[in-house]
């Protein structure tokens, strides 16, 4: 796992994109502060760049680095979540502009899964984490379901958990609006 993390960090530091296991499904990732790397992910997924992608980080303590005016309810939601939870915050900062929603919002998930948490810790920046599929196609439940077009389009494929055949599901998503308005998306 350590070698995988080191190689993935080197690739992302150079502006490349990776295929990696997360706390939910396999994801395509890159440096969430690098607009060119984010653009590569949009192109690989054949996804319109007006559709935001989420960010993965290893600690709730880092959220204030990427979110302006952190809503108080967010801390409660993070604390009580018993499954992976992506929260869409209304005002992002210090992230690639092409990663954000048209309204300046950003979805961030704090990962507790060992590999993705250690990857975030080692990289010291937030990661893009978007499903490893072409836009409009089903999300892969495990590595074996990731299409060849995605595998061939990334700069590095993490070896860790490639043999894990258990089916994973995407995270729950909650959107927080100004004034603490909560909307369940998924």
Label each residue range with its predicted role.
Residues 1-186:
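Active-site-adjacent structural elements in enzyme catalytic cores
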